[in-house]
Amino acid sequence: MDTATKTGYADVLVGLQYGDEGKARVVDHLAAGYDVIARFNGGANAGHTIATSEGILRLRQVPSGVLHPRVSLYIGSGCVIGLRQLASEIEMLAGQGIDLAGRLTISDRCPVVQPAHFLSDRRDGGRIGTTGNGIGPCYADLAARMRGGERSAFQLCDLMRDESRVFEQMMRLAAQRDDEDIAVLIQEMRQAWQVVRPFVTDNPVALLERVEGGARVLFEGAQSVMLDVVQGAQPWVTSSHTLPSYAYVGGDLPCRYHRKTIGVAKAMVSRVGSGPLPTELGAERSEAYCADAGREGRGRADEAARFDPRALLAQGDAFSTGIAIRMLSNEYGTGTGRPRRVGLLDVAQLQLAIRQFGVDEVYLNKCDSLAVFAQTRDRCIPVVVGSRDGNAMHVMRFPAFDESVIPRDDATPLPPQLETLLEWLADVLGRPLRGIGLGPQRAQMRLFKTQP
């Protein structure tokens, strides 16, 4: 990494909708301009995907700058650590020739997900659509501090001091909640800890020292602002703070170094699990269908076997259109494989998020998915711009474009229909569009120096 002589800075990147906006691919494109990519919230419930020419790289806890060998990676104290998942991820990356030694640093203040947390989440989390990775119970025990006269939460620093005592206490806590044999889980965690331990630091100003030396940091948010534990719609939220301002608490850096906030959205809204999705295609019917599919373990393969997306589009009803869009744009959860509920782009929601959370610029992924509407009866792209009376949605319609005119390289101009839509969107959002996604591959991201 280049050695800078002046004080560095930090930017924060967050999702502006309900998750799965393609934040990782934007981080991957921006990473070369930073010295450190840092995570500040969440844990193994985050599914970040980077599509490369060699295949798909799926990450849950390691920051998305892994493909840039000169970039350091940091997991801040606001994240919870699933030892088994993180160790598996580190080993998976090593198997692909990506060595994290000397690159990855983890705060020793990160809480550890315990067997009791997995068991609790899998028993109680299904109704609100959690991933079952124990994230919520881990954060809850961190806040509770004590249960039954004993500590209820442990951080990596506790393992550093006395791992045997901590694992023994974790076993006792789990045994109080479930009859399942916990010994196997504890043994797997002991083994995973040996993989994770070399990356843990007890230096609370590790990231600050880098920035004081000139390092440029990009904080990578997990989940999205609409799922924030406070600002989101309870109880259908994640269990951590997802907002840009929290990056400096969970990322272990004073906020004085903040430079700008980057928001990522996508041209079709989607959501995994239960909770409000005002523009959902198929409304309650779609929500119930996706909930049943999640409980029964049905996803991409099941829908591919049952449905022809083009036939669904020809039917013309919102529910069928939603299934078709999900199939054609691969809207299935990265971390879970569950079908995502699909809705129209909600411009009013984006406007509020941008204003409320201080977003300076926007990236819009999945613009290629809008070509689906060329196969609908009216051949128009519907965009929700608000409600007239609190109930009926006000929808604007833009001419659709065919999939065949989507550019495959930067030299090919955008379809005029898409260009018109993007210019309008940048104007109503009041923020510059810095880039758009035109397909899943790394090369299918187009960056703008000026407005499209």
From Swiss-Prot:
Mg(2+) binds at residues 20, 47. SUPFAM superfamilies: P-loop containing nucleoside triphosphate hydrolases. Pathway: Purine metabolism; AMP biosynthesis via de novo pathway; AMP from IMP: step 1/2. Signal peptide: none annotated. It catalyses: IMP + L-aspartate + GTP = N(6)-(1,2-dicarboxyethyl)-AMP + GDP + phosphate + 2 H(+). IMP binds at residues 20-23, 45-48, 131, 145, 223, 238, 338. This is Adenylosuccinate synthetase 2. InterPro entries: Adenylosuccinate_synth_dom1, Adenylosuccinate_synth_dom2, Adenylosuccinate_synth_dom3, Adenylosuccinate_synthetase, P-loop_NTPase. Its EC number is 6.3.4.4. Its main location: cytoplasm. The lineage of its organism: Bacteria, Pseudomonadati, Pseudomonadota, Betaproteobacteria, Burkholderiales. One of its GO terms (molecular function) is adenylosuccinate synthase activity.
